[in-house]
Structures are given as structure tokens and as C-alpha cells.
Amino acid sequence: MPNRPNVRGVYLITPDEPNTQRLLLRTAPLLGSITWLQYRNKQADAALRLRQAGALREACAAHGVPLIINDDAQLAAQVGAQGVHLGEDDGDVAAARALLGEQAIIGVSCYDDIERGRAAAASGASYVAFGAFFPTTTKQTTRRATPALLQQAAELDVPRVAIGGIAPAQVPALVTAGADLIAVVSGVYAAPDPVAAVQGYRAGFAAQRGKL
């Protein structure tokens, strides 16, 4: 059976940071308060991605945090990451599962499309991600997901991730609608105090489903 974890909390995604040491310094203080970390760097070449993913894998292992690689199942296998996140043009779940194994965490971007969510769940995805819920500077998109979509996606029986311009104050409503994980990039990394920012996101879960 594919891995469909029972999870909730902050799903942190890394920014496009070219300096590996700085990426580690920015990320390490946050690892004790997040559920998953996704390595995403759209500006890096293959060599830098390998170095950064390997360094983050070691840091995550020290904190017991699963590392998910964005868009690249081969890189996930190479560094021993726990999973991969697949976008619209990043391959299929079956191929990633064959490469990474039944216990791998394989997520799929479903944007504002419940049918894509149904297809992902049927193919064995570990989780589905919907968004953007709000305007975001991290990724240009005109697609907008809604809390109603999260509610509808309960039928999929897989964890639901909400992503896209989400501020801490917006977390309780999304959790109430069914979000298991809140994915965030700039809301944490661009905050004046990233550690406090993570706690702000966590507090949104505590208000709705009991303390994390």
C-alpha cells in the first residue's frame, strides 16, 4: 500500500537560495517546529541542487523531519530523501513510486482542480496540494483554490495541503475546511523572525484541532 501519512502542521518549502551554507543557517532553526520540509530551488543547476538537497537531508535527519524534493524523483533517490512533490509536468505517481518505493511520500499539485486530485489519489499519491488560496509572489499563477475545494477533497481520503500566499491569521479557516498541512515559503523565510513566524502558523492549528 502507498504511504498515506496521518500528518498535520507546517509544510515548509525552501526559497531560491544560492548559498548552501546560508540555506542551512536559515532552515536549521525551523526544523524543530515543522512537519515536513520540501527542497525547492528553481534557480539552481543540477550540481547545486545535489549539494543543497544532500545537506538538507542530513539536517532533516538530525531532527526527524522528512525531506521532500520538489519536481525531481531522481534527486530524491540520489540523496535518500523521504519523497518527492510532483507538479503538472513532473512525471507521474506510478513512476515515482517505482523508483522511491512504497513508503515514499509522493505528493501532487492539484491547483484548483478536484479531478486532478481524484486522479492523483487513485494513482497512489500520498497527499494532494491545492492552491494558490491567496495572491503569492513565490510562484506566478492565476489559479485560485477555495476552502470549499478543501471540503470537497475530503472524499479523496488522503492528506490535503493548502498552499499559496497563506498568512498565519488565515490558517484556522483553512484547517476548519480540511487542510492537514499548510505549505509556506515567504511567509516564514521572508519574515523578520522566521522562528516566530512558524509558531504563528502552528498556532492556527492549535486553535482548531488541539495543540500541536
UniProtKB/Swiss-Prot annotation:
Q: Which cofactor does it need?
A: Mg(2+)
Quote the catalytic activity from the record. Answer: 2-[(2R,5Z)-2-carboxy-4-methylthiazol-5(2H)-ylidene]ethyl phosphate + 4-amino-2-methyl-5-(diphosphooxymethyl)pyrimidine + 2 H(+) = thiamine phosphate + CO2 + diphosphate; 2-(2-carboxy-4-methylthiazol-5-yl)ethyl phosphate + 4-amino-2-methyl-5-(diphosphooxymethyl)pyrimidine + 2 H(+) = thiamine phosphate + CO2 + diphosphate; 4-methyl-5-(2-phosphooxyethyl)-thiazole + 4-amino-2-methyl-5-(diphosphooxymethyl)pyrimidine + H(+) = thiamine phosphate + diphosphate
Q: Which GO terms describe its molecular function?
A: magnesium ion binding; thiamine-phosphate diphosphorylase activity
Q: Any keyword Metal-binding?
A: yes
Q: Part of which pathway?
A: Cofactor biosynthesis; thiamine diphosphate biosynthesis; thiamine phosphate from 4-amino-2-methyl-5-diphosphomethylpyrimidine and 4-methyl-5-(2-phosphoethyl)-thiazole: step 1/1
Keyword Hydrolase listed? The answer is no
State the signal peptide span. none
Source organism superkingdom: Bacteria
Q: What class of enzyme is it?
A: transferase
Q: Which GO terms describe its cellular component?
A: cytoplasm
Alphabetical UniProt keywords: Magnesium, Metal-binding, Thiamine biosynthesis, Transferase
Q: Please share the entry's free-text remark on the cofactor.
A: Binds 1 Mg(2+) ion per subunit.
The positions annotated for binding Mg(2+) are: D71, D90
Q: What function does this protein fulfil?
A: Condenses 4-methyl-5-(beta-hydroxyethyl)thiazole monophosphate (THZ-P) and 2-methyl-4-amino-5-hydroxymethyl pyrimidine pyrophosphate (HMP-PP) to form thiamine monophosphate (TMP).
Annotated protein name in UniProt: Thiamine-phosphate synthase
